[in-house]
């Protein structure tokens, strides 16, 4: 995400969870089968979602949690304005009350799920797009459905990850999963989405957009009377562009050009883009940009937008995953470092320009910290890439390039941590990098 950094943040206190003895992240190998139907303008979607999953932990899995991130801005709503995301008619388990400001739903399984076994839960889902310009929101006739679809929470050695929603950045932590999604909508609406998409005729005046997405961490889509164009990159990636009619034409062209160039370049630097298709959605007033697997939302002016940063997120968060609440620098700083290099910006002295609010502040702080220091959150986008640029100068450009490509390979579709990266970097040199990490507040 690259935003104006002026949004308000939700509560910073993470929900407590008891750590279990089974360290493997679970439930894993999830598959989501979703069928939704929209109203006339794409602002309301209803249907059914089924998710099957495996227990990867050594411990029996007795429950799962759904994250209803779309409720994050509105928590539990009011009697006159209920929460935007509603789950009902659950089968395959017994639902409890909503918790964590109505962003978490516990479902107790009928019997403990042993290691390696699979089961599924299914439920009705209702999504009402909020009246705000945001990743789950709207702008004019455009509808954005980012983080709208309920997804499984993750349990690992730290317990269940039930962190609060933050508007300032991201709270999201998900394992790579498969999605099969059918979106039934008026034919006047174009519906870009995560995955490889195709359209089928529906009822009179309606179209069904069908998407298949494998090994992705989330599923997002947009809907609107978009103008469209497609390009295939020299590397073979289909880039589909969608833009609102009032988006500046010059900015649209710049954004499309940068999307095509950056996805191929990052494929060479970090590993070939595996999803085949990227949808780029542009509107004139969207705040900055927001990344999802195979889909980016870009606020686009005459000068273009933050598309290069968001394309870089396809690797740093999408392919190489991380817990975005506990370690936001692992995706934001890495994506911005890739952006700096793509743009050719001079980073020789940028670390010396960094101002830290206090001696204890660290680049590797969690969103619990940044939510309380909103004016300093820009450091993830400024100090972070500067630190990585300094690491490049310390290791040498060729070694840094090899580090990132091998690091991406070793964590492809997995989850990375700061400790993983520190170990990987140290393995590339005989020089003790301890003083480097300390000086750059990577702790």
Give the ranges of each region predicted by the language model.
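Beta/coil-rich, acidic/histidine-enriched accessory regions frequently appended to metallopeptidases
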Residues: 37-41, 412-443
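Zinc-dependent metallopeptidase catalytic helix centered on the HExxH motif
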Residues: 282, 293-352, 404
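Extended, low-hydrophobicity, Ser/Thr/Pro/Gly-biased non-transmembrane segments
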Residues: 69, 121-220
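N-terminal, polar/Ser/Thr-rich
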Residues: 1-46
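Hydrophobic helix-coil surface modules that form long, contiguous segments used
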Residues: 171-308, 337
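Solvent-exposed beta-hairpin/edge-strand motifs
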Residues: 62-95, 146-149, 184, 188-189
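A surface-exposed beta-strand-loop module
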Residues: 80-141
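Acidic/His/Gly-enriched intrinsically disordered linker/tail segments
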Residues: 326-397, 405, 411-412, 428, ...
């Amino acid at each position: 995400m690259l935003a104006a950094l002026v949004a308000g943040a939700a509560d910073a206190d993470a929900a407590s969870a008891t750590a279990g003895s089974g360290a493997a992240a679970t439930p894993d190998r999830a598959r989501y089968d979703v069928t939704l139907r929209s109203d006339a303008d794409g602002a309301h979607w209803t249907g059914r979602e089924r998710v099957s999953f495996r227990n990867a932990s050594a411990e029996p899995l007795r429950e799962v949690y759904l994250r209803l991130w779309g409720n994050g801005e509105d928590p539990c709503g009011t009697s006159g304005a209920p929460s935007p995301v509603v789950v009902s008619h659950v089968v395959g388990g017994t639902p409890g009350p909503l918790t964590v400001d109505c962003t978490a739903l516990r479902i107790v399984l009928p019997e403990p799920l042993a290691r390696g076994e699979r089961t599924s839960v299914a439920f009705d889902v209702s999504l009402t797009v909020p009246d705000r310009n945001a990743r789950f929101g709207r702008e004019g006739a455009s509808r954005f459905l980012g983080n709208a679809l309920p997804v499984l929470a993750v349990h690992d050695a730290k317990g269940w990850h039930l962190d609060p929603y933050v508007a300032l950045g991201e709270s999201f932590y998900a394992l790579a999963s498969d999605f099969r999604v059918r979106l039934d909508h008026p034919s006047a609406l174009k519906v870009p989405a995560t995955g490889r998409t195709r359209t089928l005729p529906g009822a009179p005046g309606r179209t069904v957009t069908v998407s298949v997405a494998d090994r992705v961490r989330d599923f997002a889509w947009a809907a609107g009377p978009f103008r469209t164009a497609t390009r295939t990159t020299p590397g073979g990636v289909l880039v589909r562009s969608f833009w609102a009619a009032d988006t500046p034409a010059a900015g649209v062209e710049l954004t499309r050009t940068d999307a095509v160039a950056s996805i191929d370049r990052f494929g060479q630097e970090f590993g070939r883009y595996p999803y085949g298709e990227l949808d780029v959605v542009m509107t004139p007033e969207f705040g900055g940009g927001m990344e999802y697997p195979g889909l980016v939302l870009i606020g686009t002016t005459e000068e273009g937008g933050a598309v290069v940063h968001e394309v870089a997120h396809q690797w740093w968060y999408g392919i190489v995953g991380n817990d975005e609440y506990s370690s936001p620098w692992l995706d934001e700083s890495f994506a911005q470092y890739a952006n700096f290099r793509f743009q050719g910006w001079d980073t020789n002295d940028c670390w010396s320009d960094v101002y830290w609010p206090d001696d204890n502040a660290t680049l590797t702080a969690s969103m619990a910290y940044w939510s309380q220091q909103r004016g300093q959150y820009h450091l993830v986008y400024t100090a972070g890439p500067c630190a990585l640029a300094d690491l490049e100068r310390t290791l040498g450009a060729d070694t840094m390039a090899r580090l990132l490509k091998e690091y991406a390979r070793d964590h492809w579709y997995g989850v990375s941590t700061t400790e993983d990266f520190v170990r990987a970097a140290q393995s590339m040199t005989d020089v003790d990098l301890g003083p480097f990490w300390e000086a750059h507040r990577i702790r």
